[in-house]
A protein has these predicted regions:
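N-terminal leader/targeting and accessory segments in enzymes
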Residues: 1-82, 86, 262
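Acidic, Mg2+-coordinating active-site environments of NTP-dependent enzymes
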Residues: 59, 63-68, 158-161, 173, ...
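Walker A (P-loop) phosphate-binding motif
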Residues: 86-128
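Switch II (G3) loop of P-loop NTPases
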Residues: 162-170
Length: 262
């Protein structure tokens, strides 16, 4: 097939509830959106899904299957992004906040949730239970955006307008957040971690740096430390520095911390 417009498929509400993004989540009647750079792996996942009686597979031209249930779209990337509107039709009107750093993401996210109020939802390392009914995939610090929007599209989650996300280096490196824009992002710190994936500190830092690009964020907050200042040197976005320096945008003092804890 050449280019595809999802509206041509006239999905029912039941179809949309059965949208999935992994062969692990396929059940009879599922509509699977899937792609992979490795053709053999893609064919394997598609074959697994067909055996599970998937209703429809929407994939890229990279797939070899000629099964009638498989639609191969030349414009798969556009089609996949369009699926987000079906999962959560108001997702673009929500405010997103991203937090990255080796340590402190979870704590910062929890504080931010309290500051932003009851319309706020924090998604990160410890929120695996939120996704237990969404996907059978292993919970990630930064879940797939597809699954996040599937969660936000559920009636119980429609009330959340401020979405706070832990942004892991893996997720940023794999472009897992493509499709949303962060109102404000934050950088906490950086130390040696995940070298099994990134191999060195510079690759690790460059993955984190993606969050502070024009493609993903409008502005950001950073801590006055070695790597925070490197973020500021490498990003052209408006920024706010948190420091004990009296010239900082946001002043941090031990007295202020003591007052908060008392």
């Amino acid at each position: 097939m050449s280019e595809l417009n999802l509206s041509e498929l006239k999905f029912t509400e039941i179809d949309i509830k059965n949208f999935v993004n992994s062969s692990l989540d396929v059940e009879e009647g599922s509509v699977l959106f899937i792609n992979h750079d490795d053709k053999d792996k893609l064919d394997k996942y598609v074959d697994e899904s067909l055996k599970k009686k998937v209703k429809l597979v929407i994939t890229s031209l990279n797939c070899s299957s000629n099964d009638d249930k498989v639609i191969k779209a030349k414009n798969y990337s556009e089609v996949f992004l369009d699926s987000y509107n079906y999962l959560c039709n108001d997702y673009e009107s929500k405010k997103y906040f991203g937090i990255t750093g080796t340590n402190g993401k979870t704590t910062t996210g929890a504080y931010l949730k309290e500051l932003l109020g009851p319309e706020s939802l924090f998604i990160g390392t410890n929120e695996d239970e939120l996704f237990s009914e969404i996907t059978n995939e292993k919970h990630l610090t930064s879940p797939k955006l597809f699954n996040i929007l599937k969660l936000l599209g559920k009636s119980d989650f429609k009330k959340y307008n401020n979405i706070i996300l832990e942004a892991s280096s893996h997720a940023l490196d794999q472009d897992r957040f493509n499709g949303i824009r962060f109102n404000t992002s934050g950088f906490t710190n950086l130390s040696q971690d995940h070298f099994d994936y990134h191999t060195n500190i510079e690759n690790y830092f460059n993955s984190k740096l993606k969050l502070f690009s024009n493609q993903l964020s409008d502005k950001y907050v950073y801590i006055d430390n070695e790597w925070g200042n490197k973020v500021a040197q490498n990003s052209s976005l408006p920024s706010f520095k948190i420091s004990s320096d009296t010239q900082a945008c946001l002043l941090y003092t031990s007295d202020a911390a003591d007052e908060q804890l008392s």
